[in-house]
Structures are given as structure tokens and as C-alpha cells.
């Protein structure tokens, strides 16, 4: 049986491997996703400056009022829409997607698809 610490360590190793290749610039910042057991977080980061330009999560007060649960696909879809709306309002239309070492399915995929539908290109 794989312990929880082993899974977390393997995910961190995958994320470091991905981060060697995925780099956000001012023209195409990085859309970074983190998934915990209860929440999902998305940030758009300019790696050249080291600044977070836009962020959204299931902890946002306006999003909490609209969703019943914070750990399902519907919540991830709402976070994807919200981060895309915030990015487009700041003039960001193209990003590089960083899945954070997680598999591209389930909540991660729903967030990415919702962000694409809302107007982000990646």
C-alpha cells in the first residue's frame, strides 16, 4: 500500500520535472494549479518577475456563496471560469498551463476546460 507521504513526494518530484520545462513570461504567464483534499487553487504567475498576477480558489468569498461543495468538479469549473475572467480583465489572454504534478483528469481537467471556454488560450 502506498502511503500518503510517498504519493505527495512523487507528486512534488513530478512537479519539479515539469517546472524545468514550463516557464511563464510577461507575454504568456503560467497558470499554476494546486489541488488539496478540500479545495482547489489557481494562480497566474509571471516567472520573470516572480509575481502572482491573478488568483482564484474555492476559498474566495464570492465563489463560496455560489457553490455547495468545494472539492468536486463543479467547484473546479467555477474556479476555472473565475480565474479566466480575472485574467481577461487584466489583459491576459494566453497562458502556459502548469498542472502541478497532478494527473490531467478530474478536477484539474475541469478547471482547465472551464478556463479555455471562458477565453484563455493554452
Curated annotation (Swiss-Prot):
CDD domains: Ribosomal_L18_L5e. One of its GO terms (biological process) is translation. Keywords: Ribonucleoprotein, Ribosomal protein, RNA-binding, rRNA-binding. The lineage of its organism: Bacteria, Thermotogati, Thermotogota, Thermotogae, Thermotogales. This is one of the proteins that bind and probably mediate the attachment of the 5S RNA into the large ribosomal subunit, where it forms part of the central protuberance. The keyword rRNA-binding applies. One of its GO terms (molecular function) is structural constituent of ribosome. It comes from Pseudothermotoga lettingae (strain ATCC BAA-301 / DSM 14385 / NBRC 107922 / TMO) (Thermotoga lettingae). Belongs to the universal ribosomal protein uL18 family. This is Large ribosomal subunit protein uL18. Pfam families: Ribosomal_L18p. It comes from the Bacteria.
